[in-house]
Amino acid sequence: MNPVYSPGSSGVPYANAKGIGYPAGFPMGYAAAAPAYSPNMYAGPNPAFQPGYTPGTPYKVSCSPTSGTVPPYSSSPNPYQTAVYPVRSAYPQQNPYAQQGAYYTQPLYAAPPHVIHHTTVVQPNGMPATMYPAPIPQPRGNGVAMGMVAGTTMAMSAGTLLTSHYPTPVAPHQVTMPTYRPPGTPTYSYVPPQW
């Protein structure tokens, strides 16, 4: 046993070696005995609140509103049959059976911002303001040589490179070169401003 920590028995006051003053209501000793355990959450009997669950008590509310039997188990989280509510939507992207990606629609849960701007009337939710067609990606110019298929190696497209059509070369022609003033000291040292 730890000689420094030697708890006293029940009802023995704490050892106050330094004479420290404690506020009113501070427990100056161990409790005589722990309070008895009560299964009630709240003290005192309350007829509206039952103290605990009695085993074998039937449910107050039935699981099924029409009969007292428990509905059969279904792995689907949707309690409604699919045939009762047809899956139909005015927006193709929200319809799981429509062609995906045909149009980009705005799923509207309120009116578009420009409709309710500076107004206090709640506008009805109508058709989307715009239906964007699916964007066509712009052709990107890559750094592949002319005649070479992108994503291939040189060995795969060497025949295409060698046999592809090239324009006929231009015949040599005369090029006139202008005559330049030979370098030297300029004859002027000041250029007047061009007002």
UniProtKB/Swiss-Prot annotation:
Q: Which residues form a coiled coil?
A: none
Transmembrane ranges, per UniProt, are 19-43, 144-162
As for subcellular location, the record says: Cytoplasm, Perinuclear region; Cell membrane; Cell projection, Axon
All ranges on the Extracellular side of the membrane: 44-143
GO CC annotation terms, alphabetical = axon; perinuclear region of cytoplasm; plasma membrane
- Membrane topology classification: Multi-pass membrane protein
Q: Which residues lie on this side of the membrane: Cytoplasmic?
A: 1-18, 163-195
Main subcellular location: cytoplasm
Which domain of life does this protein belong to?
Answer: Eukaryota
Q: Does the keyword Endoplasmic reticulum apply?
A: no
Q: Which UniProt keywords apply?
A: Cell membrane, Cell projection, Cytoplasm, Membrane, Transmembrane, Transmembrane helix
Tell me which InterPro entries the record gives.
FAM168A/MANI
Alphabetical list of Pfam families matching this protein: TCRP1
Name the PANTHER family on file: MYELIN-ASSOCIATED NEURITE-OUTGROWTH INHIBITOR-RELATED
Give the protein's function.
Answer: Inhibitor of neuronal axonal outgrowth.
Family membership, please give it.
Belongs to the FAM168 family.
Query: What is this protein's record name?
Result: Myelin-associated neurite-outgrowth inhibitor
Organism, per UniProt? Xenopus tropicalis
